């Protein structure tokens, strides 16, 4: 995939013809965010987080989306011992903080979040999140920007987060419309400038 070629963590994704109640359609299946996903993407096992949908649904309707937070997805890694628990709790706290800062500044930040920058976890040259945001928008995969659809890997070696591609809806039948309208959608020029400012 394009994102995999750009060295982003991506799950195995494939289309399957299924029949539900006699209606045949093509459905998209993605690999679960587990140890095998990290190994296949040449990452050491560590905490995987995802957007927490449990607090944003009320009476069957989406609400409180700006208050969305995260949760640990690979709980077995947490249970490995004191060191993995300490790493997970520190990373979880940092990611929750980034979600709260973004929630309080949603008008300015829109769908953008960089937990490394918001927590000063990486040096200013770490452009992982700006580049990921740019690539997702270029692919018309904005569905993956929804905060309860996001996934994150915490790299224990450099103490920083990495985005994990998930549910971008790139294969959607309305994707062509998204690509045609992407030019008219606002995009923070600073994100592009920060990510690709050295491409003069």
What are these regions (language model features)?
Residues 6-18:
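Short, well-structured beta-strand/strand-turn elements
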Residues 17, 141-153:
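Catalytic-loop signature of eukaryotic-like protein kinases
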Residues 18-19, 23-27:
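Hydrophobic or amphipathic alpha-helical targeting/insertion segments
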Residues 34-136:
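ATP-dependent phospho-/nucleotidyl transfer catalytic cores
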Residues 48-51, 56-60, 150-152, 161-168:
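Active-site substrate-binding loop specific to GH73 endo-beta-N-acetylglucosaminidase modules
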Residues 119, 140-141, 153-200:
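C-terminal catalytic region of ATP-dependent kinase domains
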């Amino acid at each position: 995939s394009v994102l995999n070629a750009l060295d982003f963590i991506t799950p195995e994704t494939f289309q399957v013809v299924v029949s539900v109640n006699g209606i045949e359609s093509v459905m998209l299946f993605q690999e679960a965010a587990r140890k095998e996903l990290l190994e296949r993407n040449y990452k050491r096992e560590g905490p995987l987080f995802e957007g927490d949908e449990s607090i944003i649904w009320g009476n069957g309707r989406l609400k409180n989306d700006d208050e969305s937070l995260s949760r640990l997805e690979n709980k077995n890694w947490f249970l490995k011992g004191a060191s993995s628990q300490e790493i997970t709790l520190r990373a979880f706290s940092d990611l929750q903080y980034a979600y709260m800062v973004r929630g309080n500044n949603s008008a300015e930040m829109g769908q953008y979040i960089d937990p490394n920058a918001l927590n000063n976890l990486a040096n200013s040259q770490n452009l992982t999140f700006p580049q990921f945001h740019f690539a997702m928008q270029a692919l018309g995969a904005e569905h993956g920007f929804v905060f309860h659809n996001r996934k994150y890997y915490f790299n224990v070696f450099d103490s920083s987060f990495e985005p994990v591609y998930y549910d971008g809806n790139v294969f959607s039948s309305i994707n062509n419309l998204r690509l045609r309208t992407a030019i008219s959608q606002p995009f923070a020029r600073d994100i592009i400038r920060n990510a690709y400012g050295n491409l003069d």
